[in-house]
Amino acid sequence: WFIVIASNLTMGVAWHRFLAFFNIYYKRNIDKPALGALPEMLSKGKPVNFEDPAEDDVFGLGTRGDISWKGLLDMTSCTECGRCQSQCPAWHTDKPLSPKLLIMAMRDHAMAKVVETENLVGDKAPIDLDVLWSCTSCGACVEECPVDIEHVDHIVNMRRFQVLVESEFPTELGGTFRNLEKSGNPWGANKQDREGWIAECDFPVRVVSGELPEEVEYLFWVGCAGAYEERAKKTTKAVAELLHMAGVNFAVLGKRETCTGDPARRSGNEFLYQILAAENIETFKETFGNRGVKKVVVTCPHCFTTIGKDYAQSGYELQMLHHTQLLNTLVKEGKLKTSPHKADQKITFHDPCY
């Protein structure tokens, strides 16, 4: 009822003084980092059954009538301070996306008495397609917002509608989706080549074809980039060599790996994500069996987030470690020796948003 009153009185942005407390309380990822798992796809407040969706299920956020009560609360809580915009990488690289203006446009459209179209995105709608696809889903806007508006949730839900209902998405994504379906990676590379980097190592790397042997402590999830992309392969081989030097017993899945589904999910293709996630979860179950603690080490931040957070929505949880965490532990335990030296070049560490 606060939202109803707010839409009919003239206090405008001042309503955040009252609504912000409720918005913070009902934040989806309460007490968690801004960039967590993406929201499940809901229809009428319930998760969509992807194996047998109902005829009247709504896929994503397409019209102002699809906006949830939490969405309206987000929009009416906006202080218009612009902190989200000031941290947005898309905005700083001259893309048309401003998280602040997007939330304001959605709010004005939702509260308007008369509109040219009910749609949220497209011709005569408040949000242009280019705006929607400029988002990197990094979560900086959510992290910076003083009233915990969840911009990324709304953007991804609108993408879901555009992909699954309207089939309106950048042409480049069409190829990516096909490659993920057919080859299990974004580039359409041969699945057999996932083990190519192993042949370039001068030490043994165990590839498991069934259940993980008891003596193996860690499953090293290589990921698509780590297996195919030349620069990322250097990281994969370096991490594997360091684990070998430290005496860590690890194994990889090799060609049993397939993409986690992160590119599909963040691009709005929730159906494809669910297929890839289900396939990987079955592989994990076969690999870990009845093991209590299931340790997975990754180099890719996207794999780290998707497997560690998004897969948990399906009820399957793993103990995820980024390779930097494990290497740090090995150094502290004395299993890896470092030899400090003065670098003759400047080194920049990219701390990924994921």
Positions of predicted regions on the chain:
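Membrane-embedded alpha-helical bundles of multi-pass integral membrane proteins
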Residues: 1-55, 60-61
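A short alpha->loop->secondary-structure connector
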Residues: 32, 239-243, 313-319
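Short, charged low-complexity linear segments at domain edges
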Residues: 37-70, 104-125, 346
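Iron-sulfur-cluster electron-transfer modules
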Residues: 66-75, 97-103, 110-306, 310-311, ...
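The canonical Cys-X-X-Cys-His
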Residues: 78-84, 88, 141, 145
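Short, structured patches in soluble enzyme cores that scaffold and shape functional sites
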Residues: 222, 300, 322-324, 351
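Short, flexible loop segments at boundaries between secondary-structure elements
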Residues: 314-343
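Glycine/tryptophan-enriched, flexible segments
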Residues: 343-354
